[in-house]
Amino acid sequence: MNNIHTTRKANFRWVICAILFFATTVNYLDRQALSLTWKDFIAPEFHWTNTDYGNIAAAFSIMYAIANFFSGRIIDWLGTRRGYLWAIGVWSAGACLHALCGWATEQWVGLDDAAQLVGAAGDVAATVSMVSVWFFLAARVVLAAGESGNFPAAVKVTAEYFPKKDRAFATAIFNAGATIGALVAPLCIPTLARYFK
C-alpha cells in the first residue's frame, strides 16, 4: 500500500511540473504578442508610433523588474498555491484589460462607436491615440506585475514538491517553457492575429 501511495505522489509531482511548464510557456507567449503584432496589426490600426511601442515595452520591463522584488515575498506570505493563484490572477486580469482598451478609450474621449474612433481626424485623432496608448500601457503594467510571480512561484513549487535529487531536472523542465514559448510565439501569434482580425 505504501508503494502505491509513493508512486501516486511521484506521478503527481510530474503532473505539477507539466503544469508549471505550460504556465511558463503561456507566460512567454504573452510577452511576445506585442512585438509580433505591433508592425502589421496594432500600430496601423491605432496609428501608434515606434515611440509608443518603446514606451509600452519600457513600462512593461520596468514594472516586471520592480514587481520581481515583491512577487517572491507575496508568494512566501500567501503560500505556494494561493501565491501562484494570485500571480496568475493578476496576469490574467492584465491580459483581459488589453481587450478593454478600445472601449475605455471610447468612454474617455466620448465617441460612440469604433467607426467614429477610426474616422477621427486632427486633434481628436491625436487625443484618441494618446489616450489609447496610456490604457494599453496600463494593461501591460498589470500584466507585468502578474507575470513576475511565475518564476518565484514555480521555484517554490519545485522546492516543496520535489526531492533534492529531482529538483534541478524539474526546474529545467518548467524553465524550458520560457524558450518554447519564445520559439512557438512567432509561429502562432501572427497566424492567430490574422485569423481574428
Annotate each language-model stretch with its function.
Residues T37-A65, D112-V118, V128-V131:
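Extracellular/periplasmic helix-loop-helix junction of adjacent transmembrane segments
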Residues V15-N50:
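Extracytoplasmic
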Residues A139-G177:
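Cytoplasmic helix-loop-helix junction between adjacent transmembrane helices
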Residues G89-S129:
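C-terminal ends and interior cores of transmembrane alpha-helices
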Residues A178-K197:
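Helix-loop-helix hairpin linking two adjacent transmembrane segments in secondary transporters
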Residues Q32, S61-F69, A182-L183:
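Residue-level signature of mid-helix packing/kink "hotspots" within the transmembrane helices
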Residues A67-G79:
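Helix-to-loop junctions at the C-terminal end of transmembrane segments
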